[in-house]
Amino acid sequence: MDHTDNELQGTNSSGSLGGLDVRRRIPIKLISKQANKAKPAPRTQRTINRMPAKAPPGDEGFDYNEEERYDCKGGELFGNQRRFPGHLFWDFQINILGEKDDTPVHFCDKCGLPIKIYGRMIPCKHVFCYDCAILHEKKGDKMCPGCSDPVQRIEQCTRGSLFMCSIVQGCKRTYLSQRDLQAHINHRHMRAGKPVTRASLENVHPPIAPPPTEIPERFIMPPDKHHMSHIPPKQHIMMPPPPLQHVPHEHYNQPHEDIRAPPAELSMAPPPPRSVSQETFRISTRKHSNLITVPIQDDSNSGAREPPPPAPAPAHHHPEYQGQPVVSHPHHIMPPQQHYAPPPPPPPPISHPMPHPPQAAGTPHLVYSQAPPPPMTSAPPPITPPPGHIIAQMPPYMNHPPPGPPPPQHGGPPVTAPPPHHYNPNSLPQFTEDQGTLSPPFTQPGGMSPGIWPAPRGPPPPPRLQGPPSQTPLPGPHHPDQTRYRPYYQ
């Protein structure tokens, strides 16, 4: 800019500034001469230069200034605009009308363009733009371009009507609702993590499941007496843990079981199975009572009295007591609960003689036996208590006459208490019909009560031995039973 201004000033004024102008122009002329060496008339150039300096200085200045303008002034003014022309336009404020659209835009995997109308492949549920889908179909390819699955038809869907799975790259399945998409994610993609939990659950459930299966088997098996004999071992296996709690009580049960089943297994396992398998036994006794015993009361009584413990023994006793197979099951169930069942022979008199108070020694026992049958309904509780609790069990059996019967159970004198007799007559009709044999086990515990209560607490076998003698005074009907039971108890 300075050079051009000075040059223009020098040309305009031929005064003192002329020398300066000449000096400044000399290099320019030299440069011009060097550039135009081939030209024949250098003077003419001077005249040309001089003339333009005065009249058309724009020629010389234009040539030189053109370059200078582009390099200096012109470059700054026009160059900036050319280099950043957008700045001028974006200086204006722009008001954007409308709202942001939350609807996602998907791009076609075939053409890479945003999809406005979807072509949805059925049944693979992949989407492409409708044009690509139609073209692909026209080519005769009935396979999805994405997954190579056969395509039955192509659905036309608008933007915003589909929900695409993006949980796993490459899935890209589309669904018509968010609910369907979530179900797909849970079923296809979240299932990978679930198998572990399911496996763990399965591991947890298997142990639980087997017992239920055993229980149903027990329920199914009880009807068959022979099966019942097999059932006790399962119950024993299942019940071993509970025996610890019922160890004393179990000992009493063990003698009965020993007689009824293998002593080794019964001594250890039988007590626990009773506690756990009481329910199963109850069911089995119910079935037996229904099948074998005619009276319905047996079902109700047996249901309550059926406490599982006797069930295993009934199977074993059944073969032994073929004469009284039906009654033996319910009664056996009852005595095992009391754990003084070994003296079953007295029960027969109980069923009939129960009403008879003449039996001096056995009457109190009969009373207890009569009262116990109702408790038999609550047989399971008695089983849980230890041997000493057998009396406590009797109170549960005495649930109908709870106050009176328990004391008699503890001691002979209480046994003779008349109130129990009152309860006995009430329960006698039911027991006589339902449990002719059931009453005997109760009578046995009653008869054994004076001598058995202490002995059974210690060793279960001695009470059994004591039981038969106490039974001996019982009427004749009991004796045949005693003969049957005695071999087992002895």
Swiss-Prot record:
SUPFAM superfamilies: RING/U-box (SSF57850)
Stretch list, region Disordered: 34-60, 254-490
Domain of life, per lineage: Eukaryota
Compositional bias (Pro residues): 341-358, 371-388, 398-422, 456-477
Pathway the protein contributes to: Protein modification; protein ubiquitination
Gene Ontology biological process: mRNA processing; negative regulation of cell adhesion; positive regulation of cell migration; positive regulation of endocytosis; protein ubiquitination
Chain intervals annotated as zinc finger (C2H2-type): 163-189
Residues in RING-type zinc fingers: 108-148
Gene Ontology CC entries for this record: cytoplasm; nuclear speck; nucleus; RNA N6-methyladenosine methyltransferase complex
Modification after translation (UniProt): Phosphorylated on tyrosine residues.
Annotated spans, HYB domain: 147-205
Record PTM Phosphoserine, positions in chain: 200, 284, 289
Cellular localization per UniProt: Nucleus speckle; Nucleus, Nucleoplasm; Cytoplasm
InterPro entries: HAKAI-like_RING-HC, HAKAI/CBLL2, Znf_Hakai, Znf_RING, Znf_RING/FYVE/PHD, Znf_RING_CS
Biased segments, Polar residues type: 426-441
Keywords tagged on the record: Cytoplasm, Developmental protein, Metal-binding, Nucleus, Phosphoprotein, Transferase, Ubl conjugation pathway, Zinc, Zinc-finger
Reactions listed under catalytic activity: S-ubiquitinyl-[E2 ubiquitin-conjugating enzyme]-L-cysteine + [acceptor protein]-L-lysine = [E2 ubiquitin-conjugating enzyme]-L-cysteine + N(6)-ubiquitinyl-[acceptor protein]-L-lysine
Major localisation: nucleus
Function text: E3 ubiquitin-protein ligase that mediates ubiquitination of several tyrosine-phosphorylated Src substrates, including CDH1, CTTN and DOK1. Targets CDH1 for endocytosis and degradation. Associated component of the WMM complex, a complex that mediates N6-methyladenosine (m6A) methylation of RNAs, a modification that plays a role in the efficiency of mRNA splicing and RNA processing. Its function in the WMM complex is unknown.
Oligomeric form and interacting partners: Homodimer. Interacts with tyrosine-phosphorylated SRC substrates. Component of the WMM complex, a N6-methyltransferase complex composed of a catalytic subcomplex, named MAC, and of an associated subcomplex, named MACOM. The MAC subcomplex is composed of METTL3 and METTL14. The MACOM subcomplex is composed of WTAP, ZC3H13, CBLL1/HAKAI, VIRMA, and, in some cases of RBM15 (RBM15 or RBM15B). Also a component of a MACOM-like complex, named WTAP complex, composed of WTAP, ZC3H13, CBLL1, VIRMA, RBM15, BCLAF1 and THRAP3.
Domain-related comment: The HYB domain forms a phosphotyrosine-binding pocket upon dimerization, and mediates as well the recognition of its flanking acidic amino acids.
Record-given protein name: E3 ubiquitin-protein ligase Hakai
Lineage: Eukaryota, Metazoa, Chordata, Craniata, Vertebrata
Gene transcribed to yield this protein: CBLL1
